[in-house]
From Swiss-Prot:
The gene is rplO. The keyword Hydrolase does not apply. InterPro entries: Ribosomal_uL15, Ribosomal_uL15/eL18, Ribosomal_uL15/eL18_sf, Ribosomal_uL15_bac-type, Ribosomal_uL15_CS. It holds the Pfam family Ribosomal_L27A. Residues 1-40 are annotated as: Disordered. The lineage of its organism: Bacteria, Pseudomonadati, Pseudomonadota, Alphaproteobacteria, Rhodospirillales. Keywords: Ribonucleoprotein, Ribosomal protein, RNA-binding, rRNA-binding. PANTHER family: 50S RIBOSOMAL PROTEIN L15 (PTHR12934), LARGE RIBOSOMAL SUBUNIT PROTEIN UL15M (PTHR12934:SF11). The keyword rRNA-binding applies. This is Large ribosomal subunit protein uL15. One of its GO terms (molecular function) is rRNA binding.
Length: 159
């Protein structure tokens, strides 16, 4: 068998039947939609309509709320930070900031700042500047000989 002899199995691919192309096609006139009524027309499905039965979105109670004052931090764990240092994506000698973490691809968009968490291990002596840090993360960095500076987030200029 050669590459130019490869073929699909018989019946593996077939052309879909064209609709509304005459009586002889088997799908002419009404195109298999029957006669009149809601389902014969466009935009048939009414979202959430369950045939008159009380829909699930009305049977279940409302829960919770959206807190407009919630803070959204970009999170970085010690293990990922150490891995980036080992891979030479971050220079451990320089002060590590949100900009450096973002450039290294460790965090996404910084909304209300960066929060350092203590999952994983840090061996490098680092100086890191973040807007929030867990007690475990601070203890681990200081044990490795580094320092954590918790600073207020920089105000984003509105305009």
């Amino acid at each position: 068998m050669k590459l130019n002899e490869l073929r699909d199995n018989e019946g593996a691919r077939y052309q879909s039947k064209r609709l509304g192309r005459g009586i002889g096609s088997g799908k002419g006139k009404t195109s298999g939609k029957g006669v009149k009524g809601q389902t014969s027309r466009t935009g048939v499905a009414i979202n959430g309509f369950e045939g008159g039965q009380m829909p699930i979105y009305r049977r279940l109670p409302k829960r919770g709320f959206h807190n407009p004052n919630a803070k959204h931090f970009a999170v970085i764990n010690l293990g990922r930070l150490q891995k980036a240092i080992d891979e030479k994506r971050i220079d451990a000698k320089a002060t590590i900031t949100a900009e450096i973490l973002s450039a290294a691809g460790l965090i996404g968009k910084v909304l209300d700042g960066v929060r350092l968490l203590g999952h994983g291990e840090i061996k490098a002596k680092v100086s890191i500047e973040v807007t929030g840090a867990s007690a475990a993360a601070i203890a681990a960095v200081e044990k490795a000989g580094g320092s954590v500076t918790v600073a207020a987030p920089k105000a984003v200029a509105e305009g």
